Amino acid sequence: MLLQRLSDRHDHASFRETHQWSIENPGDFWREAWNDLGIAGDPGSTAMTGQGFSYTRWFPEGSLNVVNTLLAGKPDDEVLVALTEDGPRRSFTREQLRGEVAACAAALEASGVRAGDRVAAWMPHVPETVIYALGALSMGAVVSTASIDFGPSALIDRFGQIEPTVLLVPARSTYAGKVADHASVLDEILLQLPSVTTLVVAGGGEARVSFEDWLAPHRGAPLAPVDLPFDHPGFILFSSGTTGKPKCIVHRAAGVLLKVLSEQGYHLDVRPSDRMLYATTCGWMMWNWLVMGLGRGATIVLVDGSPGFPDLGRLWSITAGESLSFLGVSAALIDTWRKAELDPKDFGTLESLRTIASTGSPLGPEGYDWVAESISPDIVVASIAGGTDLCGCLVLGVATEAVRRGEIGGPALGLDVTVVDSEGHQVSAGVEGELVCRTPFPSTPLEFWGDTNGARMRSAYFDRFEGIWAHGDFAKSTREGGFVILGRLDATLNAKGVRIGTAEIYRIVQSIPGIQDSLAVAQPHDGDSRIVLFVVTTDELDEALETRIRQELRSQASPRHVPSLIVRAPAVPRTRSGKMTELAVADIVAARAERDTSSLANPESLEWFRQWAKGSRDL
């Protein structure tokens, strides 16, 4: 076990000792991680320079290309498997994947792409997306992916900011048995993305360049990843769009690789020859996280479509059929299985399964119990928490310790993670506060795209506490060294484990005739959470208007943006400066202690929400 070997090498008796060493000696730790994890490339003579988040540089003399690590190994090993709802199983050996990536890199170069250029993909969770991303990374381009369930408006909000020159899209996609043809929206997307000079369509499409035809002239090209500095950008991920258009978070490819492999290798005991699946889309950071699993020598399994189609046992059938050793899902899905009294063993033998990872929202003790009782008490349940901001985890499982139900194992190695009060002072175990990190790490964002003076990035993470990364999670630590995540501190909606930005909802809803104002919150409900949308309307909220709201959100954003309840309200609370105060309403509907409302211009508006909340549990 990699973590045990690290501890033994330094004569540490516990994970706590190893973690303390890693934060006191970050340069030594990350250099050892580079070597332990088999990162291909030259780290240089210095692992880090400077101090603090603003001035630390990682491997300033380093030179590498992450693709050399991701595609290293025996040529005949199966490394990628893809399963969809309605298509055949597809698989690639390492040599086949290397060939596809080489052809893609050559096609990108022939399309005029150079190192540092942005390329984007609006795609399902299929091999073409992985091949495209690796091809871009191999030549130093910056890749950004978005889920196919984003509508044109949400897509333009993201890609419009970064101005990609090449865009990969699908001809069609399938979810829950329904086939969507995307040809009708491609002209609209291209009209609003004038930077795109090459549109490539996976799965064909008349009058468009297919992915296969795009690669065809370049088949047989050698794979020749370009060595790049450690700080070279590789990914742009997007925030949830809480306070306007989503923030474009620029990540070093090398930083993400090193951070994620440290999580998979040390914390979660992902081993070469493991078979791992994470139920995700291309719009979630867990897609990037899963792809990095290639660097552990693992076989990654892509599953596109609904995890509940044709039945709730789909992922368990795949776990058995593909002999998975690692299965990653959302906490909400585990709760769905538990409430449905699903028996995973009905779908095949699960003897190869060692680890179930859970993220997206807190996993309660009942979820841990369900895994132990329905599968095996020997299964490692690894709840993990972090986010898009670091493309990795702040807290996660600890491979050398027993699982403790209802809590996350410990802080990530190399990260000084703790819980603080509103003044930034560390609080004792069991006391609720804000989750923070007090030391820089390699996957700290390089920048926000377009944030020329760094003001937006400082505001996002460092304005609350000087020199400390404020993550925005409400949490508490435990006496055993673990953590319990209690939810988000900001206004981001978290419905069924998926983060939804309210600003995206408002832009769409408030463009509908008859809607004067709107406010969306997540409300705890039936052991999970649901989105409640309050609207201020010119006339009554009738069935036709409610249907229109749902249709517009589904088509322009995604099905996940559609609220469980739409309720007419007389007014939305706002501050004197005109800012909406979602958190005040969120506290009321969640039955939490209300915060100071002295800054409100219309505090009387909250009384209506208090009365509504009293009777809302039965809705």
Q: Each predicted region: which residue ranges?
A:
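AMP-binding/adenylate-forming catalytic core of the ANL superfamily
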Residues: 121, 146, 150-172, 186, ...
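Conserved AMP-binding/adenylation subdomain of ANL enzymes
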Residues: 257-275, 285-325, 340-341
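Gly/Ser/Thr-rich phosphate-binding loop
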Residues: 296-298, 325-328, 338-403, 416
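Conserved ATP/PPi-binding loop(s) of AMP-dependent carboxylate-activating enzymes
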Residues: 411-414, 425-462, 500
